[in-house]
Amino acid sequence: MPYFVVVRERGSAWDWSVPMRRQAEWDSHAAFMDALDAEGFIVAGGPLGTEDAAAHVMHIVNAPDSETIEARMAEDPWTPMELLKTVSIEPWTVLLGGFRER
């Protein structure tokens, strides 16, 4: 199954005065992301830059296509709350490192 790089950014409802782990519905969002990790859908991910100052989050996703990724990210509790939104989904050709096919 191919890899994709998914970039999400903080949405209009993000409260910049509050740390990431204290945003509304953090526990629900974290449980959702942990489940995607456990099933191997997300193989790596996290904020770009320092955790609480980062405007963007990057994930390496193992999925058949971008439509599947869009559908799964829409299930994140933070998506309809406008805390996070997906801004790009790009196929990733891995040439170096542990993610490449051998």
Locate each region found by the language model.
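Conserved, structured core segments of small domains
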Residues: 1-102
